């Protein structure tokens, strides 16, 4: 349950940061239609836009986050041990950037497999590590021990093994 609330909270945070970056939309007195779920192609295009410069492109995340949440075409399981960094105090922009990268990479890997599979935590962390490098480049003092450890594992071509070890250490939520 804690993981679900964390995911909803971060999605709200990403949406809020995105809304701050966009001008307010004009409103009318008519009823609004239910939002359309983005297609896989729209979600992947948004993912690529975000991925090009993740720290400054949070405004591009909504289509792929909506697709993940509403399409039913991907399934992402949030692992408390792998995402423990989410509970550490840090700038909300960094947290949203890393989390969106994790979700987007996971989504893209599942769509590339052309079928709904289990969560692809390795692809998610690979993308989160790319975003982490972008954050660190802009803010060299920012550091997360788990990401440093996983970056080292990636350099040594052991990322899949390291992620699997973290995944297997996870304890199920109460």
Specify the residue positions occupied by each region the protein language model found.
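Sec/Tat signal peptide C-region and signal peptidase I cleavage site
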Residues: 15-19
């Amino acid at each position: 349950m804690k993981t679900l609330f964390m995911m909803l909270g971060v999605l709200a945070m990403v949406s809020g940061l995105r809304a701050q970056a966009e001008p307010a939309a004009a409103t009318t007195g008519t009823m609004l239609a239910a939002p359309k779920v983005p297609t896989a192609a729209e979600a992947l295009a948004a993912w690529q836009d975000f991925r090009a410069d993740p720290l400054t492109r949070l405004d591009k995340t909504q289509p792929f986050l909506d697709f993940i949440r509403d399409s039913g075409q991907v399934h992402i399981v949030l692992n408390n041990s792998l995402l423990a960094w989410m509970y550490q105090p840090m700038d909300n922009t960094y947290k949203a950037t890393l989390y969106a990268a994790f979700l987007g990479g996971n989504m893209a890997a599942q769509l590339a497999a052309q079928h709904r599979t289990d969560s692809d935590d390795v692809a998610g962390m690979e993308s989160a590590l790319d975003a982490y490098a972008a954050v660190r480049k802009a803010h060299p003092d920012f550091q997360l021990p788990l990401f440093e450890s996983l970056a080292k594992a990636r350099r040594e071509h052991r990322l899949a093994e390291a992620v699997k070890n973290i995944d297997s250490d996870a304890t199920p939520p109460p």
